[in-house]
């Protein structure tokens, strides 16, 4: 590459453009708000969040769960949140016995209860193991929030809230997903333990 500076700037510009599109979409902003309110309601009722994804989306699931359990902006009691992507014994047992497509559905069946919130992350919206988990959420009356790319894929029909990032580029979608996850964490933390804190630039 002859001009790496321009290449780097192009990536930043593309990422900023996706976020600007979200910022201008009032329906999408309202959807993020309403999804956050469902998480708050669940926690106020003594429930928990369950999160899942594959690859980079698995990392996002673990990242968001970590913010809930540990802390986000300030010290406060931990909030119950489980990333369904972390226990290698459970993952390999389910994968071996029931197939990869049941990796998360089996855990939702075992650990989820009515009133919990499941956050499924899939850039395509078509990850089979996420879709299977979403189907199980409907059976158990677990609220479902999906984070996807522009089309929403099959998640459109299965999620209570399908938050679709306006991009078809996987890295740009993932960058927006973690920002949305951070925003949800901030709203939940502030509502439950309100200290009025944020890190303004």
Curated annotation (Swiss-Prot):
CDD domains linked to this entry: SIS_GmhA
Primary location class: cytoplasm
Residues bound to Zn(2+): 63, 67, 174, 182
Compartments, as annotated in UniProt: Cytoplasm
Keyword Transmembrane: no
Keyword Isomerase (UniProt): yes
Domain SIS: 39-198
Gene Ontology BP annotations: capsule polysaccharide biosynthetic process; D-glycero-D-manno-heptose 7-phosphate biosynthetic process
EC number: 5.3.1.28
Miscellaneous field: The reaction produces a racemic mixture of D-glycero-alpha-D-manno-heptose 7-phosphate and D-glycero-beta-D-manno-heptose 7-phosphate.
Assembly information from the UniProt record: Homotetramer.
Protein name per Swiss-Prot or TrEMBL: Phosphoheptose isomerase 2
Biological classification of the source: Bacteria, Pseudomonadati, Campylobacterota, Epsilonproteobacteria, Campylobacterales
């Amino acid at each position: 590459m002859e001009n790496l500076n321009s290449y780097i700037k192009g990536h930043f510009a593309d990422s900023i453009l996706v976020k600007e599109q979200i910022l201008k979409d009032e329906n999408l902003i309202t959807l993020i708000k309403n999804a956050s309110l469902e998480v708050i309601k669940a926690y106020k009722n003594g429930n928990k969040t369950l999160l899942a994804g594959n690859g980079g989306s698995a990392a996002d699931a673990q990242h968001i769960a970590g913010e809930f359990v540990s802390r986000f902006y300030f010290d406060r009691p931990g909030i119950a949140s489980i990333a369904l992507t972390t226990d290698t014994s459970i993952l390999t047992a389910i994968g071996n016995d029931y197939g990869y497509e049941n990796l998360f559905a089996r855990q939702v069946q075992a650990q989820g209860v009515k009133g919990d919130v499941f956050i499924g992350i899939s850039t395509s919206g078509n990850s089979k193991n996420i879709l299977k988990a979403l189907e199980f959420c409907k059976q158990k009356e677990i609220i479902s929030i999906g984070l996807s790319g522009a089309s929403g894929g099959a998640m459109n029909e299965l999620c209570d809230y399908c938050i679709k990032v306006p991009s078809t580029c996987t890295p740009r979608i993932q960058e927006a997903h973690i920002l949305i996850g951070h925003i949800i964490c901030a709203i939940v933390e502030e509502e439950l333990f309100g200290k009025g804190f944020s890190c303004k630039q």
